[in-house]
UniProtKB/Swiss-Prot annotation:
Binding site for substrate: 90
Protein name: Acetate kinase
Residue positions of the active site: 147 (proton donor/acceptor)
GO biological process, one term: acetate metabolic process
Gene name, Swiss-Prot/TrEMBL: ackA
Cellular component aspect of the GO annotation: cytoplasm
Class of enzymatic activity (EC top level): transferase
Enzyme Commission number(s): 2.7.2.1
């Protein structure tokens, strides 16, 4: 029997949704409500190749959910709210409390709230979405799906920082990792494509968008990942620095007179590709600029690829080899140039990739390795919403 599930991503002033039929994993409708609580609130709903837009004042998430449900009914996408069997909600941080998705109860809500200091920008907004749906659709299961859960299988030696141990015990300071729902989806999909049990595969998953993270997945479990206590750690990103020497923070403060908060802002919003190039955080712009001979754009691309290279090499060593390299997310799926830069020179570890196949894949699924390559290289468009919907069915006992 099929279930209709809403996959929800609630922001502080926005609400993204997809209505998905499970187990067929068919997208029935998707939409976005923007500027909740602000002037110029807007709703967009897409279904059957059509697009509906409307503008009206939307004061809070409860009203936003009400309007969304009304539109789904008015547009004939569902007959009434009883057609919806469950909801799944993206929650950014589950800390160590949630090693897997969870059916939302009052206690689970409190636990998510208790993790606010680990994700002050995201968890409160995610929780607003959960509470709105629980209020308006009380008779169905609501499931929280955490970005961090997939990485809770990392061993201690991977997640602990070399700090006094009591900082971990007292304050929860450790590597958590992010993009877990995406890494989980593409690794499972890779096993499906290859027709092999995931338990037999060593996978390096490269989620490369404006934010980027690399994950080492051994036997279907995350054993390491590049992001850390926050999404600032790891590889160079669009505007985030990735890994730096921590002593640079007080040094920059001393040299510039800026506060720790201001320096952190620079590391999050003015660094990465934008910081090095001085022009853009968008890889498409930088590829164009590099073609035109702009040296700093070229340098930004070289640094970007070099950092990803480093993680791929270290994760191959960690797993004593690799069977599959996956590229996913906006850049990983669409930029053959970035993929080429990252794959260049990896023949020593059994990666033989086909430039022709690589240049033909943009946003579609497929192999870019030569048939004889011991390591398979696959482009897989991520689908976090489907993963959220699957977990809504599983943990909601639908």
């Amino acid at each position: 029997m099929s279930n209709l599930v809403l996959a929800i991503n609630a922001g502080s002033s926005s609400l993204k949704f997809q209505l998905i039929e499970i187990p067929e994993e068919k997208l029935v409708s998707k939409g976005l409500i923007e500027r909740i609580g602000l002037k110029g609130s807007k709703i967009t709903v897409e279904y059957d190749g059509r697009k509906f837009t409307d503008e009206k004042e939307i004061n809070d998430h409860v009203q936003a959910v009400n309007i969304m449900l009304d539109n789904l009914i008015d547009l004939g996408i569902i007959r009434d709210i009883n057609d919806i069997d469950g909801t799944g909600h993206r929650v950014v941080h589950g800390g160590e409390l949630f090693p897997e998705s969870a059916l939302v109860t009052n206690n689970v809500e409190k636990q998510i709230e208790s993790l606010t200091e680990l994700a002050p920008l995201h968890n409160p907004a995610n929780l607003m979405g959960i509470r709105a749906f629980r209020k308006l659709l009380p008779g169905i299961p609501h499931v929280a799906v955490f970005d961090t859960s997939f990485h809770q299988t990392m061993p201690e030696q991977a997640y602990l920082y070399s700090l006094p141990f009591h900082y971990y015990k007292d304050y929860g300071i450790r590597k958590y990792g992010f993009h877990g729902t995406s890494h989980k989806y593409v690794s499972q999909r890779a096993a499906e494509i290859l027709g092999k049990p995931i338990e037999e595969l060593r996978i390096i998953s490269c989620h490369i968008g404006n934010g980027a993270s690399i994950a080492a997945i051994d036997g279907g479990e995350s054993v390491d990942t590049s992001m850390g206590f926050t999404p600032l750690a790891g590889v160079t990103m669009g505007t985030r620095s990735g890994d730096i020497d921590p002593a640079l923070i007080p040094y920059i403060m001393e040299k510039t007179g800026k506060s720790a908060e201001a320096v952190l802002d620079i590391l999050n919003k003015e660094s990465g590709l934008l910081g090095i190039s001085g022009t853009s955080s968008d890889l498409r712009d930088l590829e164009q600029d590099a073609e035109e001979g702009k040296t700093r754009a070229q340098l930004a691309l070289d640094v970007f690829a070099s950092r990803i290279h480093k993680y791929i090499g270290s994760y191959a060593a960690k797993m004593h080899g690799v069977d599959v390299v996956i590229f996913t997310a906006g850049v990983g799926e669409n930029s053959d140039e970035v993929r080429a830069r990252v794959l260049e020179g990896l023949e020593f570890m059994g990666v033989y990739w086909d430039p022709k196949k690589n240049s033909q894949l943009h946003g579609t699924e497929g192999f870019i390795n030569y048939p004889h390559s011991p390591v398979k290289v696959i482009v897989i468009p991520t689908n976090e919403e489907v993963m959220i919907a699957r977990d809504a069915v599983k943990f909601g006992s639908l």
